[in-house]
Amino acid sequence: MSKINKLEHIRNIGICAHIDAGKTTTTERILYYTGKSHKIGEVHEGGATMDWMEQEQERGITITSAATTCRWQDKIINIIDTPGHVDFTIEVERSLRVLDGAVAVFDGVAGVEPQSETVWRQADKYNVPRMCFVNKMDRMGADFYRCVEMLKDRLGAKPLVIQLPVGIEENFKGIIDLIKMKAVIWKDEALGAEYFEEDIPADMKDKAEEYRAKLLDMVVELDDHVMEKYLSGEEVTAEEIKRLIRKGTISAAFYPVLCGSAFKNKGVQPLLDAVVDFLPSPIDIGIVKGMEVSTGEETDFPISVTEPFAALAFKIMNDPFVGSLTFIRIYSGKITSGTTVINTVKNKREKIGRMLLMHANNREDVKEASAGDIVALAGLKDTTTGDTLSDIDQQVILERMEFPEPVIELAVEPKSTADQEKMGLALSRLAAEDPSFRVSTDYETGQTVIKGMGELHLEIIIDRMRREFKVEANIGAPQVAYRETITKVCEIDYTHKKQSGGAGQFARVKIIFEPLKEVKDLKDEDKNKNFVFESKIIGGAVPKEYIPGVEKGLNNIRETGVIAGYPMIDFKATLVDGAFHDVDSSVLAFEIAAKAAFREGMPKGNPKLLEPIMQVEVITPDEYMGDIIGDLNSRRGQIQSMDPRGNAQVVTANVPLAEMFGYVNTLRSLSQGRAQFSMIFSHYDQVPSQVADIIKAKK
């Protein structure tokens, strides 16, 4: 197959949905029927091929997106299986960025669930064409038609029904193909590998005709010639219908809806046919956005094998046998083992060593890969998620991915000194794999703080640290970093004297402390500082060599404020006068005097406690708005704005961080899991006096 031609035969797809809708089971069946897997893996037995981490097989949920390659008809399908739990939406986001199309799996009983809405919005953001598979049609309470209505109501989507179920619940035995107008029935005893076509059952004829008419009404709008033919009463051929469904799917004019039961092995082969027939190849996507490094100009790059090499790294994974693996999606050109390329984001060269095609966690070495391929590279040194790898002579940076800020943090400390070094290595490796996981050190407590997207996210990180890196750690409760400041100008004149035989100590300082916002002639470079020091000594009242001692003393002592021992910020100290002794004065004496002046003077400045305020954004369906706003108000939140976005509402509020612990769980229960939120640090603000009293009492 020529390389140019090959692009038409590739489908890069994701399978995404709410937790438990049956994504992983659907993927397992696809691998089985395309011949990649000789035994079907069942999720509830902990044997699914795609769920290859220990934690996944125990919990029966997918945490990392496993990538695998299979063939159907004459097409190559690269599948990314993505997690459905809200704490792992970053994995979904990464996958969607590099996919050309997606299959959204819905639970036939539950319909459109909360995480389905989140994933759908993420797919909208990256303009990913998609089709819908209503799964679990064999389950008690499954209702295909209700699911179709929910697609319209909850997602604002335009569903195009191309199949109807034959039989319901335990009597579900097949589908009606509305393109061919035939029933497709599966033999139970053949594990779904055998199925046959027959005429539509008599009791379903009318329903099939009704939905066939709806299908034709929607697709003929995309082609004037076919519309004329249809309106004049001529038959529209199956090939014409398929061509128009493909056109409408790629342009997101509508979303084809199919049905089946992956667990009962029904409906998977027609789903594969639809992936090949209707979802785009890299050529259909045509271009990718990016920036030319030499000119700095934004431009569109054609997806083509003949163009210079450009690829996006979308996932880092630690493989126990190969080491660090970097998953890349190649957008243009080709690479071979041994080639040197450049990471244009970091401006570092990388040599391509082993190149692997992945099948869940089995691997196959390849020597060459080209546009449209998704491969894993072993041994890259500097490349992280979101980086571009490019041809050295024609350098480009592809559109970067955006990652949400972590919303929950915990302190961790190693149980023993042996764990100390291992913990540092483990956390840095895990952070390289997952951009939504951050590690920092709290300079006040010296503790290591880990931050993530939710409690399950951090629980799994700690679990992986224990299993993969053999690190035992103690986990602390989340903490808030309070600060202190003064609210009015105060002045202190302090003399430090010490005589106890031998050389004495003497230093006198007169200092004015003032809140930064009240300083009239503040220099621009000082406006964002927490502490500003200035000396206005004239005529040598304090010799020049002693003045740094005053600044050092103030800088050290301000780390423990006068209310509850939190760092003092947003103030200016001006040294206006002082006195010294020829023999007994020293830098140390002036440092001690400055510290004592701070302790005595600051309480006169009406000090106040400050707390971090977060900007919180909640995206919620309309019906939960009242409860969510009421809850934010009860958390001392101030609503900033409320705006519609699609068929959801976006509420922005400023809320103290101390009130946000446990909010993930509250929001889930208030909205039945349908709302989502993100938060970023906004500013420090005064703590109300009654809350400040409680904080002081705890110190």
From Swiss-Prot:
Keywords: Cytoplasm, Elongation factor, GTP-binding, Nucleotide-binding, Protein biosynthesis. SMART domains: EFG_C, EFG_IV. CDD domains: EF-G (cd01886), EFG_III (cd16262), EFG_mtEFG1_IV (cd01434), EFG_mtEFG_C (cd03713), EFG_mtEFG_II (cd04088). Coiled coil: none annotated. It is found in: Cytoplasm. One of its GO terms (cellular component) is cytoplasm. Gene3D superfamilies: 3.30.230.10, 3.30.70.240, Elongation Factor G (Translational Gtpase), domain 3, P-loop containing nucleotide triphosphate hydrolases, Translation factors. SUPFAM superfamilies: EF-G C-terminal domain-like, P-loop containing nucleoside triphosphate hydrolases, Ribosomal protein S5 domain 2-like, Translation proteins. The keyword Cytoplasm applies. GO terms for molecular function: GTP binding; GTPase activity; translation elongation factor activity. GTP binds at residues 17-24, 81-85, 135-138. GO terms for biological process: ribosome disassembly. Residues 8-283 form the tr-type G domain. The keyword Protein biosynthesis applies. It comes from the Bacteria. Catalyzes the GTP-dependent ribosomal translocation step during translation elongation. During this step, the ribosome changes from the pre-translocational (PRE) to the post-translocational (POST) state as the newly formed A-site-bound peptidyl-tRNA and P-site-bound deacylated tRNA move to the P and E sites, respectively. Catalyzes the coordinated movement of the two tRNA molecules, the mRNA and conformational changes in the ribosome. Belongs to the TRAFAC class translation factor GTPase superfamily. Classic translation factor GTPase family. EF-G/EF-2 subfamily. HAMAP family: EF_G_EF_2_B. This is Elongation factor G. It comes from Rickettsia rickettsii (strain Sheila Smith).
